[in-house]
Each structure stands twice: as structure tokens, then as C-alpha cells.
Amino acid sequence: MFANAQTFHPAVKIEFEKVVYVRQQMKELASDWFDIIKDRLPEKAVSYYEFIGDTLHSIYRQTKEAVIPQNMWYQGTGEGNVVYNDYALGQTITKKPVAEETFLINDSLTKIRWKLTNDTRTIAGYDCKKAIGFIDDTLAVFAFYTDEILITGGPESIHGLPGMVLGLGVPRLHASWFATKVETNGVPLAGIKPETKGRKSTRGAMMATLDNILKNWGKYGSAMRLNYVL
């Protein structure tokens, strides 16, 4: 079955580029006053992350923030997330800034309902297959994974496919993540450790707190909530 086993990698370090199309996102989030603020919004915000992991566990964190021109305004969500996943135990410890507070979420891995497709794409030199995922039946994601990397992870809380996710698109968030560099030799696995600081919580309790904050924000609050589902 694995005639060319050396091409299957059990550990990896990946650099991801995250792009948020800010004007498109804000047009949906704040349609009532978008025309007033659109000229002060950047067209897009580009930030960078690293994923380090093996078949047992992984860490995902930001390495470079988006650079926004001084005369522009953009307050990203999820930019400070640090996601530690334990695939063996099916657990996650995620540091997640929410409003003025930082949560430390200790919970089971995010439940994602996947549908595999026959579509393919090459990303960072790897042949990838497309899958469509649904998180909490509220947020659809499009993922491209390669079975040459044996880790079932991806950017943010994405996991559960038969290979590593190298490309991710979330239409409702007007955001995408794509691998720009993949290293499979000398992977620094000793650095895979969960965060320890933050308000200890579960995913459900954190979302309940967020709902309480956003309950009077109307349509904007409902749309904003989706940014914290991933």
C-alpha cells in the first residue's frame, strides 16, 4: 500500500498566509453604515501563522500581524488565537481573545461535518483534495488537504480530514488561509505546548459570554458571532 513510504510525512512545520478581505467582510457585517466607513477600510489584511505538529498533537499561532496603513481602520478577530490540539485524546486547549478578555478554552476538538469531493488543487507543491465542512451547522468551510502529510490538522481549529489541510476558505468570513512553505525535516516538536494563561472556560461557556455581549448589537452582533466559531 505504501510502496513509496518516504513521501508520507508524520511531522511538519507550515507557514500560512491568512487574507481577510476587509471591505467585503465589513459590507456584510455593517451594511447600514458601510458607505460611511468604506474609504477608511483597507481592501484586505494579510497576516502570517505557523503550524507545527505530528500525528499526536500540534500548535498553531500567529507569527506576524497584518500591517494596516495609519489612515486606515481594521480590528481583526481571531488574530491572537493560539490553538493546541491533542489528536490522541481528542482535546483542544485554545487561547482566544474575545472583546476585552482572553479565554483559555479546554474542550473536545471542534465537531466538523465533512463532505469529500473529487476536486483537486496544488498548494505549496502538494496535490490536495477538496472537502466541504460544516461547523455547528452554522459555518461552511472549504478545505484542501493532502494525504502525503499524515496529520489530520489544519489552520485554526480545523481537523478531521484524512490528511493535512494546506488551504482553507471561509466565505462567510471573507477569509482564506494558504500554506506558503512546508518543512518536513527537523521539525521542532519540542515547542508544541499549550498556552496556560487566560480565563479558563469551555467552548460553550465562551460562546454564551459572547452572546451576552452581542445580544443588543442586532444584525451586526449575529454576524460578528461567526468570527468566533472557527
Stretch-by-stretch model annotation:
Residues 2-5:
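Sec/Tat signal peptide C-region and signal peptidase I cleavage site
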Residues 7-230:
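Extended soluble regions of mature proteins
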